[in-house]
């Protein structure tokens, strides 16, 4: 049985978060953790936090199944766009530039299975 973890309203642009999500898609959980720990991207900290939550949710939903990190696989991971906060930056000649502070929603689903071969 699969388990899911969702991280909402993360103050990172979805484009930057999707780069990190693509690194661990289809990988085993222990490999994904190693990739994220060695990543220099700031978004990798939030992804590893959500990945740990998904593994804990799997253990909670399946108490009889003692699956380790090497048995669980990141089945699906996707990033949706969250609400955008709009700010104004003063510009020359009485104008204003719009600054869009983007956010995103991260969803990770883990399940027992084989990693996806590329």
UniProtKB/Swiss-Prot annotation:
Key word Oxidoreductase present: no
CDD domains on file: Ribosomal_L22 (cd00336)
Pfam families: Ribosomal_L22
GO biological process assignments: translation
Keyword Membrane tagged: no
Assembly: Part of the 50S ribosomal subunit.
Protein function: This protein binds specifically to 23S rRNA; its binding is stimulated by other ribosomal proteins, e.g. L4, L17, and L20. It is important during the early stages of 50S assembly. It makes multiple contacts with different domains of the 23S rRNA in the assembled 50S subunit and ribosome.
Stated name of the protein: Large ribosomal subunit protein uL22
Species the sequence originates in: Prosthecochloris aestuarii (strain DSM 271 / SK 413)
């Amino acid at each position: 049985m699969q388990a899911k973890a969702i991280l909402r309203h993360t103050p990172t642009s979805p484009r930057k978060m999707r780069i990190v999500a693509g690194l661990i898609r289809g990988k085993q959980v222990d490999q994904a953790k190693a990739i994220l720990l060695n990543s220099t991207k700031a978004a990798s900290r939030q992804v590893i936090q959500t990945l740990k939550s998904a593994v804990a949710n799997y253990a909670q939903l399946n108490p009889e199944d003692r699956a380790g990190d090497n048995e669980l696989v990141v089945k699906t991971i996707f990033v949706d766009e969250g609400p955008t906060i709009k700010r104004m930056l003063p510009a020359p000649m009485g104008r204003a530039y719009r600054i869009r502070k983007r956010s995103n929603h991260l969803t990770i689903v883990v399940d027992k299975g084989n990693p996806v071969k590329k």
